[in-house]
A protein has these predicted regions:
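Mature catalytic domains of secreted/periplasmic carbohydrate-active enzymes
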Residues: 1-414
């Protein structure tokens, strides 16, 4: 069996590599996560009152987009409507439960799309399929699905070309429920024929293949596994989405943040199997970007300044090594990118605490002939020996004053 060729818009999505997820809504005012309405069994009329204090006065779409861009993100996926049912966009009469009817009196998605366009970032729209707000979801599901379809139609018609739509919530009803996905996706293709369509399969079904119109499978809060595309009718991309702490929407008492090193490792290990990495940020009550979360993205950006070429242009390569070490091959076939984890540091034993090793690293199944290897961060040449399919490389440690979590070398091919 053969592997189907990727459609261009899907391969373009894969090349984006790294994106920012943004969860922001009425729930952000409470600071207890995006599921607070459900988890605390809140009365919906009381929850709706949060709309009366939603001013979005701190929301600066351009600042948000620049935070993503400076981190090396090529796209952003923003919650246009989450499970609470409140829309950040003008629903054009479908509902009064939206940002233009709040004290904000603004179409926040318009501002977001405009800022993305200005700074060369591809805008994606998250949209819930589950809705705790409208009674239609429980009482007249067919009518609800038409409301959902019309809502998505508004997003597809009114904001120019978008990168894609990221749906979430089909896991909320029993297996076999008819969500009328064909009709929903047909509407998208009518207005956005090259939009990436994602429908999150949730924590319990990572990587599951769904409707034929789906373009990418999801790995929520878990590192992706290699995709077996042999015999597939259509080439599918893959994407891991992850929080920087334990909540998607802001949790004001959640300080369990992942380290920059862990986030960088996850980005790299996503690219090892050809998956994108979608890392979340949760703005504050009125849209301000949290300084600590912004700083985390900033540190990733400093790493991406050195190694972004490998993240964007590298594709999975079958060479094997010890630990997490791996290789990617450039799209143009001119380079191998060698990712080295847990590298030690060069320094005085009285002050330097190294990683697991520095020295010789072996790779097997290296089918390409190499003419030279250098660290991408400083251009220093590395000694290596290649024999048949084996490569042994002397991975020199970090110079004192430098420690980058994952270090990448570039090997020029003959």
């Amino acid at each position: 069996m053969s592997i189907p060729k990727a459609k261009k818009y899907i391969s373009d999505f894969e090349q984006l590599g790294f994106g920012m997820f943004v969860h922001w809504g009425l729930y952000s005012q409470l600071g207890r996560g995006e599921w607070v309405c459900f988890m605390e069994n809140m009365n919906m009329p009381d929850y709706e009152k949060l709309m009366n204090t939603f001013t979005a006065e701190d929301f600066d779409a351009e600042k948000l987009v620049l935070t993503a861009k400076n981190a090396g993100c090529k796209y952003i996926t923003l919650t246009t409507r989450h499970h609470e049912g409140f829309s950040l966009y003008d629903t054009c009469g479908l509902s009064d439960f939206d940002a233009p009817h709040s004290p904000a009196k603004r179409d926040l998605i318009r501002e977001y799309v405009d800022a993305c366009s200005k700074h060369g970032i591809v805008p994606f729209f998250y949209h819930t399929t589950l809705d705790w707000h409208t009674p239609l979801f429980k009482n007249d599901f067919d009518a609800y699905l038409e409301y959902l379809r019309k809502s998505v139609e508004v997003l597809c018609k009114n904001y120019g070309k978008i990168g894609g739509l990221w749906f979430d919530g089909n896991w909320s009803k029993p297996e076999g429920t008819d969500w009328k996905e064909d009709e929903l996706y047909k509407t998208i293709r009518k207005y956005q024929p090259e939009a990436i369509i994602v429908n999150n399969t949730g924590l319990g079904a990572r990587g599951r293949v769904g409707n034929p119109e789906i373009d990418s499978v999801t790995f929520e809060q878990g590192r992706p596994t290699p995709m077996d595309r042999e015999g597939m009718e259509k080439y599918l991309a893959a994407e891991m989405c992850q929080t920087v702490n334990d909540h998607w929407g802001i949790g004001s008492r959640d300080i369990n943040y992942k380290s920059p090193k862990e986030l960088i490792e996850n980005l790299c290990l996503c690219r090892k199997v050809g998956a994108n990495y979608l890392l979340n940020i949760g703005p504050g009550a009125q849209g301000a970007v949290d300084p600590y979360q912004s700083a985390l993205f900033g540190l990733i950006g400093r790493w991406m300044e050195l190694y972004g070429e490998a993240i964007y242009n590298g594709r999975p390569y079958a060479a094997g090594s010890s630990g997490n070490n791996f290789m990617l091959k450039s799209v143009d076939g001119k380079y191998l990118y060698i990712f080295v984890f847990d590298l030690g540091a060069i320094g005085n034993a009285n002050v330097t605490v190294g990683g697991k090793y520095s020295g010789s690293i072996a790779f097997g199944n290296v089918k390409d002939e190499i003419k030279g290897i250098e660290w991408m961060d400083n251009g220093k040449k590395l000694e290596f020996v290649q024999s048949n399919d084996m490569l042994c490389m002397n991975a020199t440690g970090y110079e004192y004053g430098s420690s980058l979590g994952v270090r990448v070398a570039r090997a020029a091919l003959v």
